[in-house]
Amino acid sequence: MAEKIIETAYAKINLGLSILGKRKDGYHEVSMIMQSVGLCDEVIITEGEGIQISTNLEGLTCGKDNLAYKAAALLAEKYNITPNVHIILNKKIFMAAGLAGGSSDAAAVLRGLNKYWNLNLGDDTLETLAAELGSDVPFCICGGSAIAKGRGEIIVPLPDMPETIVVLAKLRNLDVS
């Protein structure tokens, strides 16, 4: 077990989104072009008791409803691990802005705990686990440029986008996710 793992959780934007219909499971069938951006959170994993979450962002739930907590609980359950971790979320991604802040943190927790617990899981396995947590989480495992299909769980990598300056704005009282 490592002493401390630090993972970067990059925000993502949708460059294109097509809603292709409603699925039997209640989700929408989509085709999206997704792109990681430089805005990111930092996820630090250290020893703790059970699953502890702390954050620098006031108002963010740190309990069992937090997606990072759910990611840790899922991985511990699937691989029969008694979790003793403290997960610190240093948030810079805006909440409810459609930038996958929670999803990217959950993906970073999966990647980080994979290392912390020496599970040696491949990206495909992590993406499959990520799909149990949410539609954006599988993309956030590897990030970059990709097409996401299905409900977002089918990831088809694209060539890297050239470096581009993007300005993101979020109105204070408008939640988009």
Would you name each region that the model predicts?
Residues 2-8, 12, 16-18, 22-32, ...:
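ATP-dependent small-molecule kinase catalytic core of the GHMP/sugar-kinase superfamily
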Residues 3-83, 96:
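N-terminal beta-alpha supersecondary unit
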Residues 68, 97-123, 139:
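DPxDG-like acidic metal-binding loop motif
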Residues 76-86, 112-131:
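Phosphate-handling active-site elements
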Residues 87-95:
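Membrane-embedded alpha-helical segments that form the functional core of polytopic membrane enzymes
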